[in-house]
Amino acid sequence: MDIKLKDFEGPLDLLLHLVSKYQMDIYDVPITEVIEQYLAYVSTLQAMRLEVTGEYMVMASQLMLIKSRKLLPKVAEVTDLGDDLEQDLLSQIEEYRKFKLLGEHLESKHQERAQYYSKAPTELIYEDAELVHDKTTIDLFLAFSNILAKKKEEFAQNHTTILRDEYKIEDMMIIVKESLIGRDQLRLQDLFKEAQNVQEVITLFLATLELIKTQELILVQEESFGDIYLMEKKEESQVPQS
C-alpha cells in the first residue's frame, strides 16, 4: 500500500513550516527545538523505511553541526562560528519565506486573470488529507516521532518484546476503529499503549494514516504542540472549534 505524505518543496520549506508553528519572528524562534523537530521527522521517515531524498539529508547534516556547536563550551571563537551558522540558516529561511509569499501572490493574480479568460478546470484533484485547524501531515509525524522514541525507550527498559512474523495494516485499521467504539475521541498516544514492539507501533501509525487518507478518521489539534486526538468522521459531523 502506498501512503503519500504531504510534499514539501525542499528542506527549507519543511523548516519554514516548523518555524511558522511558533508564530513569532523567525530570528526569535528557539532554533535548537526546530532542529530537533526536523531531525526527528527525518528519523521517523527512515524508521518507517520511507524514502528521504538527498537534499533533506544534507540539510540534516548541517543542522546537526549547528546543534553540536551550540552544545560546545562557550569558547568565543567556537561560539562566533556557531552563531554565524545559525544566523545564516535563519536568513535562508527568511529569504525563502519572502520568495514563497511572492510566488503565492503571483499565483493568486494569475488565477484571478484566468477566471476572466478561460473556463475553470473541471478535473477533480486529490489532495493529501490535512489535520483540521490547518494542521498538516507534518504535525502528525512530529507527534508520532515523540511517541516512537518513547516506546523504543520503554521496550529497551523492559528487555522483553513480543515479536510476530508480520503485522498487516488492514488488521491494524480494524484495531484503530475498534479503539474509538464508545468514545467521542482518542488521544493519539493512547492508541499505542498496548503495542508490544516497534514494528507494531509503526504499523498502527500506517493504519491511522490510511484511515485519514480514506476519510474515515479526522484529527484534531487545538493548539500548536498540543495533543492530537483521533475522531471518527461522521456524516455532517461538526468539528469542535478551538
Curated annotation (Swiss-Prot):
Its main location: cytoplasm. It is found in: Cytoplasm. The keyword Cell division applies. One of its GO terms (cellular component) is cytoplasm. Keywords: Cell cycle, Cell division, Chromosome partition, Cytoplasm. Pfam families: SMC_ScpA. It comes from the Bacteria. The keyword Cell cycle applies. GO terms for biological process: cell division; chromosome segregation; DNA replication. Participates in chromosomal partition during cell division. May act via the formation of a condensin-like complex containing Smc and ScpB that pull DNA away from mid-cell into both cell halves. Belongs to the ScpA family. Component of a cohesin-like complex composed of ScpA, ScpB and the Smc homodimer, in which ScpA and ScpB bind to the head domain of Smc. The presence of the three proteins is required for the association of the complex with DNA. This is Segregation and condensation protein A. The gene is scpA.
